[in-house]
Amino acid sequence: MGETIASEEMHRYFDGLEARLKEAIEIANRARARGGDPRPVVEIPLAKDLADRVENLIGVKGVAEKIRELEARMSREEAALEIGKQVAEGVVGSFPSKKDAVEAAIRVSMAVLTEGVVAAPIEGIDKVDLGKNDDGSQYIRIFYSGPIRSAGGTAQALSVLVGDYVRRGIGIDRYKPREEEVERYVEEILLYKRVASLQYTPSEDEIRLIVRNCPVCIDGDPTEEAEVEGHRDLERIGTNRVRGGMCLVLAEGLALKAPKVKKHVNKLKMDGWDWLETLIGGAKSGESDEDEQKNKIKPKDKYIRDLIAGRPVFSHPSRPGGFRLRYGRSRNTSFASAGINPAGMVLLDDFITNGTQLKIERPGKAAAMSAVDSIEGPTVRLFSGDLIRVDDIKEAYEVRQQVEVIVDIGEILINYGDFLENNHPLMPSPYVFEWWIYDYESVCSEKILEKDLKNPSASLALKLAEKYNVPLHPKFTYLWHDINRNEFEALRKFVAEKGTFLEGEGEGEGEGILKLPLEDSVKEGIKPVLEKLLVLHKVKEGGIFVEEALPFILCLGLDRSLKEKVSMPDTGDMVEAAGILSGFKVYPKAPSRIGARMGRPEKSDLRKMSPAAQVLFPISNAGGMTRNLVSASDYTSCMNAKIGEIEVELGLRECPACGKESYFWRCECGEFTNPKLSCPRCKIDVRGAETCPKCGRKPTSVANVKLDFRPIYKQAFENVGERERMDIIKGVKRLMNGQMTPEPLEKGILRAKHDVYIFKDGTVRYDMSDIPLTHIRADELGITAARLRELDYKEDIYGKPLERDDQVVCLKVQDLLLSYDGAEYMLRTAKYVDELLVKYYKVEPYYNAETIQDLVGVLMIGLAPHTSAGVLGRLIGFTKASVGYAHPFFHASKRRNCDGDEDCVMLLMDGILNFSRSYLPEKRGGKMDAPLVLTTRIDPKEVDKEAHNIDLLARYPLEFYRATQEIKNPTEIESIMDLVSSRLGKPDQYEHFMFTHDTSNIAAGPLKSSYKTLGSMIEKMEAQLSLAGKIRAVDAPDVAERVLKSHFLPDLIGNLRSFSRQRMRCIKCGEKFRRPPLTGACPKCGGNVVLTVHEGAVRKYLEISKEIGERYGVSSYTRQRIELLDYDICSLFENHKVKQLGLSDFMSGSAR
């Protein structure tokens, strides 16, 4: 910690950001001093480093300095434990009781472990208490709640270790559970798995082992409605409901992360944790196939177990034709993001685009997709019979309607760092150009242009192989491992007997064409073999024509006249056979396949609450279902009622200066108001006391009041000089903050004017999928090189002066790109903020923006949903992709990776001007997703450690490719890879990054995923199955079966159950009833009462399920389930005893 280690240029960059931030805060403070905000100053404290964030988040004074001191001489985890001990002992901070000290200690330690970013230390731990063992000794009880999930398994587990470390330091005994308590934990965790979800579920014996031996009591608040059936009403467990926080910490924390806990226990030499060995031993017995059988990586089908309709499967596990693994990093991949060719995005029916999440087989669980056009695209068979590989997006659009089968979906680019992060064995690398060039350089000094080496002619490839013994170039290496010996021999025999090799006139050796008879090729099954090998060919004039065919012919052991020159070797390995027959070194083209299916679609959309709001002002039911303030101003509860008088729940306040009562933060006289506290039972004033002197209840300022809203509404319009011509201004029914005090109404009027919406804290936000970006070009950002120079970008990655729009430069760590849609929304927000400053606060405007180009260079705040710390950023450009591009460190500083996560941005001035803690909901999780602190400078040492595994090489070393063939653990070659972790504490931790694979346009590919553009779920399902039928690597009947079992059938069953248990709803006021009122109308407002679940919702997927089951021949068991559901639904909605008759039936007498 301490001073940031960076170059002078980076220091200038950081200083510039902080200077502009300081200037913005001065303007905001000046403005807030004049307005009606809860406080007259900006409420977001600034933090330069982790220590500042922890102190601001937890509120223990003096802790920041101590953390800096400890981190200078010990690891993050050790520092977290030690600071916890010192807080508990009273060395840092002062507390009224031992219990309070222990609670603060555990919160501080967890905040250090989670980089002071996530809300878990304040929201995930409800309280810490001291309990009594049966022998009279005390023990620590940590009450966890749902938001503890945001801390991650390791931090959850280490918080328990912190509790033990702290209790030892202050002399508290260990937890000694009773046997019925142990069994309660077993029942409760297994029940939680059924009603919620767990990443990992320990066995019953593992749960017993943890509870009996854990020195701290893992307790929690009830979070689920479900209750345990046995082991109820236990003396030391205060609820029968399921405690979600406890289940998460025990299962996903201690049980799953036991090896990491053990590592820290050993470091600290703590006794009493020997039982972890037993726990780890039990977990190892269930290890994956990769660990059990190092030399063979087996397919994993976990990613396709729960398929969702409309989200296609692109490849079944490790299946030929699926994604071919290619190692490397592009400037828009890594950090859990992977790359595919944008031509593949188009030919996969636009389901994948930039930012689309794919659930993948390995190395992790998911990855967000990015366009990388320097890797191979899909190979497809056209209706004409041609087999072509499509690498160019323009060609993809031209041929997409002609595609019959997607034989191979192309390469997927995954960097070494993702294998290291997931501790996944390195899978064998294909023989690619990056590897081949090492072999070429080691034996050949001949100067050949790189573009000729990347895409050589057949004659050049053969010359290099024959003259220098260089392995056959990847361009002419086919997928020999995808065919068996019989297919190889049949192909060899067919080419020898029926093929014709046509030498090209005046062309080099090997440039000829192989012609095969089409009809015989199809009849004898040779064409499918060519397709499996990815031997590209054209079909015309009754023949199959393979261009540059000599390398292929030689690999079959034939000569130029198609005579057998070498007999077939006795081997089952067809790659080895091709090498022996040709006399060249031939390596596997695609030894590793990766299965994938679509996860979430990409996101680029404004953030709204549900329902949407433009001002935090309560109007109860007076605004109707739309919460419209315009309607509320004209509301009358009855004929004789006053217009605009509404009954709402508000906090009563009074001015300490003039004594006037109010509902607002500031009195008309300019003084800030105080809550007017009274006892909710005795109705007496209670000032300056924590409880009522008569009954002992906690006082409150909140009451149901009759608010004369109309004059407040009119005055607000006058205050900002606007006319009352708006159709709708969206308020809220009820406030959620503790003091029930609203925002100034003027803000809502101006937001409605500019059509912007707020979140729970009063800020305007825009959500986008996270994609990493380490290098940029001006021509991709919608700006010029001159504008980039104004933003302090001086040179490209090769050290040349920045002069052209197409030069590649290294992205600075706090710079980001917005989608064009996001930029337009932020432009509207900027105009709103300026009007707010001028018309409401009576100060000068800040942005003066007329077009999105005027936003280039403005400061922003980035914030992730599960965190409580914003990060200062700078907007430098725009993208057509529906994503948010930013440096991996920027994403990591929000404790996010790029596996499909989405975060939000807000304008800095909007955040510091409008955010207030006083608006945050007074409920569990209310402080999550709020900028309680702002990180002003990103330190790579303090960001999420996953970012430390990003590799920064211009090309991977030869040793890397060799290590992949041995399926080594990635940690074994960590020292030869240039990782972020090796640069920490050096100026290069921010600069001089490189990448192995470039892309011509980071935003190439479809603008939106088909999942978002297709209409109904039925359309999406049809498109999903249509694509499954086209892809060779996908089993369409299996996809149909899985979708029925995991999506449609559970939906049908759930909707059927919901129909029979539903409540009624009034369409006017929204009141809900367990049963229909006898009058048929709402007793509250007289509105119509309707069902909340309709017959259409129940039947929604029935017909399509029957049709799909029939069309794809699903299992008889699944078909019978559909039939039973059909019978149940019919019996519920159809009365077979009643027959509908027409008038003619009655007249003819048939009605009798």
Swiss-Prot record:
Any GO molecular function:
DNA-directed DNA polymerase activity
* Catalysed reaction equations from the record: DNA(n) + a 2'-deoxyribonucleoside 5'-triphosphate = DNA(n+1) + diphosphate; Exonucleolytic cleavage in the 3'- to 5'-direction to yield nucleoside 5'-phosphates
Q: Which domain of life is it from?
A: Archaea
Q: What is its EC number?
A: 2.7.7.7, 3.1.11.1
One Pfam family from the record: PolC_DP2_N
Q: Which InterPro entries match?
A: PolC_DP2 (IPR004475), PolC_DP2_cat_dom (IPR056172), PolC_DP2_central_dom (IPR056171), PolC_DP2_N (IPR016033)
Could you list this entry's UniProt keywords, alphabetically sorted: DNA replication, DNA-binding, DNA-directed DNA polymerase, Exonuclease, Hydrolase, Multifunctional enzyme, Nuclease, Nucleotidyltransferase, Transferase
Which residue ranges run through the membrane? none
A GO biological process of this protein is: DNA catabolic process
HAMAP family named in the record: DNApol_II_L_arch
Q: How does it assemble?
A: Heterodimer of a large subunit and a small subunit.
Q: What is this protein called?
A: DNA polymerase II large subunit
Q: Which organism is it from?
A: Methanosarcina mazei (strain ATCC BAA-159 / DSM 3647 / Goe1 / Go1 / JCM 11833 / OCM 88) (Methanosarcina frisia)
What is the phylogenetic placement of the source species in the record? Answer: Archaea, Methanobacteriati, Methanobacteriota, Stenosarchaea group, Methanomicrobia
